């Protein structure tokens, strides 16, 4: 991912304020509600029958936190996202058979959730930087599919 020094600083500064548990659960929950076909990967999570059930589901929250913690690790290695996410890419490709398009969808949902949580602080410039990052992470996670 090519970010300017200013963009890297802004992305890192905002990430330091992110409540990974809250934002992760909301982002994964929104993915499952907005794109319901993604629920098939989470059948073991229990009740996903309504938007309310999804958003309150403790398994969704827990996995969302795990996903966002991994994303945060990626922010520490922006110059080597493919290396950082190689094992996760292999897992999602070979064992879980996740459609790599879902990584892009989740990245876009994450940007929406960050905008919701940070309001005016989430400027268009910061959104642009985060869009670059989530696109880079999605590409890295899809790497083993090629």
Swiss-Prot record:
Tissue: Red blood cells.
Residues that hold heme b according to the record: 63, 92
Domain of life: Eukaryota
Pfam families: Globin (PF00042)
Keywords: Acetylation, Heme, Iron, Metal-binding, Oxygen transport, Phosphoprotein, S-nitrosylation, Transport
Domain Globin: 2-146
GO molecular function: haptoglobin binding; heme binding; hemoglobin alpha binding; metal ion binding; organic acid binding; oxygen binding; oxygen carrier activity; peroxidase activity
Statement: the UniProt record of this protein carries the keyword rRNA-binding: no
Record PTM Phosphothreonine, positions in chain: 12
The protein's name: Hemoglobin subunit beta
Annotated source species: Tursiops truncatus (Atlantic bottle-nosed dolphin)
């Amino acid at each position: 991912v090519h970010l300017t020094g200013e963009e890297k600083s802004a992305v890192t500064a905002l990430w330091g304020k992110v409540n990974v548990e809250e934002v992760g659960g909301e982002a994964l929950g929104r993915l499952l509600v907005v794109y319901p076909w993604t629920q098939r990967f989470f059948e073991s999570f229990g009740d996903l029958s309504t938007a309310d059930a999804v958003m309150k589901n403790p398994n969704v929250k827990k996995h969302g936190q795990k996903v966002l913690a991994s994303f945060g690790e990626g922010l520490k290695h922006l110059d080597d996202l493919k290396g950082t996410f190689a094992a996760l890419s292999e897992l999602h490709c070979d064992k879980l058979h996740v459609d790599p398009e879902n990584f892009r969808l989740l990245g876009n949902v994450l940007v929406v959730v960050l905008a919701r949580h940070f309001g005016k602080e989430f400027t268009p410039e910061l959104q642009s930087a985060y869009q670059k990052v989530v696109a880079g992470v999605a590409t890295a996670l899809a790497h083993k599919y090629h």
